[in-house]
Amino acid sequence: MAVALGCAIQASLNQGSVFQEYDTDCEVFRQRFRQFQYREAAGPHEAFNKLWELCCQWLKPKMRSKEQILELLVLEQFLTILPTEIETWVREHCPENRERVVSLIEDLQRELEIPEQQVDMHDMLLEELAPVGTAHIPPTMHLESPALQVMGPAQEAPVTEAWIPQAGPPELNYGATGECQNFLDPGYPLPKLDMNFSLENREEPWVKELQDSKEMKQLLDSKIGFEIGIENEEDTSKQKKMETMYPFIVTLEGNALQGPILQKDYVQLENQWETPPEDLQTDLAKLVDQQNPTLGETPENSNLEEPLNPKPHKKKSPGEKPHRCPQCGKCFARKSQLTGHQRIHSGEEPHKCPECGKRFLRSSDLYRHQRLHTGERPYECTVCKKRFTRRSHLIGHQRTHSEEETYKCLECGKSFCHGSSLKRHLKTHTGEKPHRCHNCGKSFSRLTALTLHQRTHTEERPFKCNYCGKSFRQRPSLVIHLRIHTGEKPYKCTHCSKSFRQRAGLIMHQVTHFRGLI
């Protein structure tokens, strides 16, 4: 029966060619990436670029999503922790996803389930018959059970029928292929015992029926017995433990139970089956539970010292904001965001300008402010070469060149680059002026216009020059004033190359050129 188990596994391995329908390029690229050596490159730069190229060929980030790439990495680790023979068998089938991997292992278990039951029934029958027949066996007559050991490069052994002798030859003779030679006919018909019993009925009712049958009584009275040749009890316990833990990877090799070989192979395989890291235990446990809840369970009779008990991993849910401001109750996803927000309540401005001493809440605000002193305009238009201090200003300017005007007024047909510009324009048709001054009752279409107007009543001048101390109501007025101190003249005449601080000065200057033409 053990021969049948080995044949079933070999037949399953031979079916690998049937599943070779998937593209194997992914496996080839994976092996190239894992096996790449530093000595294959001329230097660190070339080695890094080569690894990057091989990784992209394997994972294909432009074609796969993040979840698909993670699935590939988890599948690779899952195959790595499998026993070597099972890993090789699964890779031969080229599984394309986790469902396929789990399905392949389940199919192998189902295919080998019947041979496993046959081996168990055979062992139980020998245990029942051995005490009765051992006393009547000739001294030189021994029926040796074939050795069970971890599947390796074992030769395929065909299933043969065993003849039960009456007087028996001196010993069982095995051929070169491990095939048992047939005994002579004992001279009377022998009953055929059906060994294919289900696991549920291994203790009842077939045992009682077998003991009460007439044929069995004749068999027991004919001085026929069996003797199991086992070297020692330790090998027997190792064999049973092996069959319990790995019932689907045993095969037939040799003609006796070889205790040292069995023990050596078992210890090697047991050492290979290491507990994966905790972060992988959670993902692999979820993978197994989704496909088959019983696949990842530890066998009842196994003596594993540390069974796989994955611990739940706490993850942040999307949109979760655990950091709460104690002053206003506003929540943030990151602690750094909460720290920056709390500076609004405390009035802290840790970032100071070294030129004028002005302080800012954020470092980005300080960086933009320093461009006023340096005159830096890092964002340049590729069409007209005009430069800007902010990227958003450049994007809005580029729309004037591309004529990208997606916002159109339905009243007059005029188009705008920004939705806010269209909204302000619509107020000219409706005459709407929702923003009203409470001091004089004057109304305005824009909130900014109302804010500037209210400063005439309060005499507020919030924009102060750090060079001379002069204050202004509007920020643009301060910017123009600062050009006096910095000497900046951004408006240049295209005819005579003369520069001006204000656009109005450039326009008035250009009139002189036009007068000469007239």
Swiss-Prot record:
This is Zinc finger protein 449. Coiled coil: none annotated. GO terms for cellular component: nucleus. Residues 292-325 are annotated as: Disordered. It comes from Gorilla gorilla gorilla (Western lowland gorilla). InterPro entries: SCAN_dom (IPR003309), SCAN_sf (IPR038269), Znf_C2H2_sf (IPR036236), Znf_C2H2_type (IPR013087). PANTHER family: KRUEPPEL-LIKE TRANSCRIPTION FACTOR, ZINC FINGER PROTEIN 384. The keyword DNA-binding applies. Its main location: nucleus. GO terms for molecular function: DNA-binding transcription factor activity, RNA polymerase II-specific; RNA polymerase II cis-regulatory region sequence-specific DNA binding; zinc ion binding. Residues 30-112 form the SCAN box domain. Belongs to the krueppel C2H2-type zinc-finger protein family. May be involved in transcriptional regulation. CDD domains: FYVE_like_SF (cd00065), SCAN (cd07936).
